């Protein structure tokens, strides 16, 4: 930990944050994964929202062999067998390109995975029944049916006793500390790490023959509302039961039949707790940031050797130092702005006697929070904002005999159909004038409030069923792991006209995440520069061979041209005031974004003389600082070439200068010609007077000396 007051417990793997609340800091050793292969049947399912139609199948081994004269992107094997996945995922033999070896290298031999792969199990329904994007998102809750159906079909091949004996080794970890004892090293009834592989191509690469009916690769939790077909699950945590066994699947990842090491490692990174670092709106044609090929958790999952026969995604780039730090896998130094320090940096890809990275601690960032004025008085109640919240406020309230009319004023901006607020009585959700029971994504726990209001609006609820009783009245705010909106606000809470919540004084409410606020606050956040010496070593050889551009989409939709990312010192800005890297929502800012050492924007030439920009993952290729000139390249846009010239080395990073721009001669962000906007590239750093100088590099570039001031 760089700073904080957490208290280590035991062997320091677990840290107690507050009494009765513990978190696991780092992972050591090896985790088992259960991988179930599932292929599709021919029937069309009729779900609660109707049939999605679609073609029969596919079965496995039906992906057409690509013509390598026109397709250098598709991964293909003549037989996607159990043995193929056992090698791809779990081989630890030296020199084998596998997910296990990838994680050995990322963790500097601290961590890896092993696992079992099942035979292909055929589910009843076709791919469209599980993968159609009916919900308006690229991932819909019907994928939970596929997880359920595929594990049940596989379970039919074993007796219940055989299932239980086999599955016991996959449940040794209590991920969510269900009993609150701080002991994570105990079974909890759920498979610790579950991986589903579906026949056919993934939706993220176009879906192949299935197109929009193909399942997108993702990590999620099946029926986390505990409302699935198999019941509430162990401890009420939801999930699906594996046959008639004692074990359930809750957390899962899902990947396609022809997924490479990259997509499997990326999704498993989510299972370890890492977020997406690309702009997630880009999945559906939105924005793109400049993390590009610099990290597995962005386009780096699509690294490769550059050989047409391998396709793309076979050899991912490394995680960045921020991700390795989150997992406890980084050897690092700490520097502070305004203090001179010298650091010898080894390559980020391996552990040497030198540090793999440096964290430069900056002055705390002050961010104003303007939620708007209270409905009445000087304060109101606020849920807070963020991912994975389960915030509450509760109070003992007497409901008068013959009464029970609750009124309140509410104002909210909640991620529609994904996040919800609730009115609760004795812990149960109750109906209000703002609540709904619709549940398109499986995240409404019942009578949820979602979407947004236009200012303060009245809310009513009938609590007459509790008349004459004293109850625990409460509000709850529950969010998923993405797209945190401002949240839920409530004021002037009354029962039968008697005020029970004005937020003006201590009225007996107990807060767990909720708080009172005037609506205007100033919050401070930690922020850092994260330095890493990126070299063409190990899986980062793909920085030299793997970055690509679809330069001929008008004639060759599945052909890419390759170029290299520049090795050297990568400076990332880690800003904890953000929870994501969605620069389309907040240009120039994000959770952790690379500083572009050569920030002059690159434009396509030829037929796009209107100033159309190259996409940020191309702009970011020369982001590193160092002693060498950048490489020159020629890239294409619909076959029209553009020459990118070599630029002088950038030896010094100084945050007193700007490495980000919101406009160029052709327009500003939001009004610039073309899809990609100026403000999406690089990051707007704070002016703290910090500088980082690359003083020297070894003759082979493996080590560098840097000075921080």
Model regions: which residues?
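Active-site-proximal segment of zinc-dependent metalloprotease catalytic domains
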Residues: 1-290, 709
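Loop/turn elements at helix/coil->beta-strand transitions in domains of secreted/extracellular proteins
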Residues: 30-34, 189-194, 292-293, 408, ...
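Non-catalytic C-terminal accessory/binding modules of secreted extracellular proteins
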Residues: 46-93, 97-110, 114-117, 144, ...
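Extended, low-complexity, turn-rich repeat/linker tracts enriched in Gly/Pro/Ser/Thr and Asp/Glu
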Residues: 401-403, 411-420, 481-484, 539
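Extracellular beta-strand-rich recognition modules
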Residues: 404-412, 470-478, 503
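Short, surface-exposed tryptophan/glycine-enriched loops
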Residues: 447-472, 476-480
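Short, tryptophan-glycine- and acidic/Ser/Thr-enriched carbohydrate-recognition patches
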Residues: 505-517
């Amino acid at each position: 930990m760089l700073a904080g007051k957490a208290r280590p417990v035991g062997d320091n793997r677990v840290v107690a944050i507050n009494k009765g609340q513990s978190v696991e800091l780092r992972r050591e050793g090896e985790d088992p994964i259960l991988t179930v292969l599932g292929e599709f049947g021919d029937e069309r399912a009729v779900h609660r929202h109707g049939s999605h139609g679609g073609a029969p199948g596919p079965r496995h081994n039906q992906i057409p062999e690509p013509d390598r004269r026109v397709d250098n992107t598709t991964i293909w094997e003549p037989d996607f067998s159990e043995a193929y996945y056992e090698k791809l995922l779990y081989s630890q033999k030296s020199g084998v390109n596998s997910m296990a070896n990838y994680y050995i290298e990322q963790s500097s031999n601290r961590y890896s995975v092993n696992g079992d792969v099942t035979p292909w199990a055929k589910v009843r329904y076709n791919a469209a029944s599980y993968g159609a994007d009916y919900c308006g998102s690229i991932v819909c809750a019907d994928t939970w049916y596929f997880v359920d159906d595929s594990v049940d079909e596989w379970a039919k091949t074993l007796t219940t006793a055989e299932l239980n004996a086999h599955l016991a080794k996959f449940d040794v970890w209590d991920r969510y500390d269900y009993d609150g004892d701080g002991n994570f090293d105990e079974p909890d009834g759920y498979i610790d790490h579950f991986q589903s592989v579906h026949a056919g191509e993934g939706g993220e690469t176009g879906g192949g023959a299935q197109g929009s009916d193909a399942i997108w690769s993702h990590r999620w939790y099946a029926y986390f509302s505990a409302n699935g077909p198999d019941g509430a699950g162990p401890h009420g945590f939801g999930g699906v039961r594996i046959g008639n066994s004692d074990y359930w699947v809750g957390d899962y990842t899902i990947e396609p039949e022809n997924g490479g090491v990259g997509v499997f490692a990326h999704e498993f990174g989510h299972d370890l707790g890492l977020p997406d670092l690309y702009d997630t709106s880009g999945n559906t044609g939105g924005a793109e940031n400049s993390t590009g090929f610099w990290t597995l958790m962005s386009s780096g999952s699509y690294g490769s050797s550059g050989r047409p026969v391998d396709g793309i995604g076979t050899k991912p780039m490394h995680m960045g130092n921020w991700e390795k730090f989150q997992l406890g896998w980084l050897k690092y130094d700490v520097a502070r702005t305004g203090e001179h320090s010298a650091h010898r940096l080894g390559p980020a890809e391996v552990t040497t006697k030198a540090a793999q990275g440096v964290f430069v601690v900056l002055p705390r960032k002050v961010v104003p929070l303007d939620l708007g004025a209270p409905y009445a008085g000087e304060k109101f109640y606020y849920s807070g904002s963020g991912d994975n919240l389960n915030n509450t406020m509760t109070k003992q309230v007497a409901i008068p005999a013959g009464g029970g009319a609750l009124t309140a004023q509410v104002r909210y901006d909640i991620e529609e159909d994904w996040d919800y607020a609730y009115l609760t009585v004795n812990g149960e959700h109750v109906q209000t004038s703002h609540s709904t029971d619709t549940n398109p994504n499986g995240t409404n726990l019942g009578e949820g409030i979602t979407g947004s209001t236009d200012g303060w609006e009245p809310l009513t609820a009938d609590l007459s069923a509790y008349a004459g009783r004293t109850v625990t009245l409460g509000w709850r705010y529950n969010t998923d792991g993405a797209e945190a909106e401002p949240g839920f606000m409530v004021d002037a809470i009354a029962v039968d006209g008697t005020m029970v919540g004005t937020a003006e004084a201590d009225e007996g409410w107990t807060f767990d995440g909720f708080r009172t606020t005037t609506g205007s606050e100033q919050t401070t956040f930690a922020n850092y520069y994260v330095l890493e010496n990126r070299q063409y070593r190990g899986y980062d050889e793909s920085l030299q061979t793997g970055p690509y551009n679809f330069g001929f989409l008008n004639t060759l939709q599945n052909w890419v041209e390759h170029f290299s990312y520049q090795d050297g010192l990568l400076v990332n800005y880690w800003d904890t005031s953000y929870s994501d890297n969605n620069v389309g929502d907040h240009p120039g800012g994000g959770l952790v974004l690379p500083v572009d050492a050569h920030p002059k924007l690159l434009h396509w030439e030829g037929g796009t003389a209107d100033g159309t920009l190259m996409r940020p993952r191309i702009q970011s290729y020369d982001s590193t600082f160092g002693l060498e000139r950048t490489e020159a390249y020629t890239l294409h846009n619909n076959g029209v070439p553009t020459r990118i010239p070599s630029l002088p080395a950038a030896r010094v990073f100084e945050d007193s200068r700007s490495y980000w721009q919101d406009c160029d001669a052709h327009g500003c962000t939001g009004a610039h010609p073309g899809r990609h906007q100026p403000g999406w590239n690089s990051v707007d750093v704070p002016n703290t007077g910090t500088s980082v100088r690359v003083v020297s590099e070894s003759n082979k570039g493996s080590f560098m000396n840097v000075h921080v001031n």
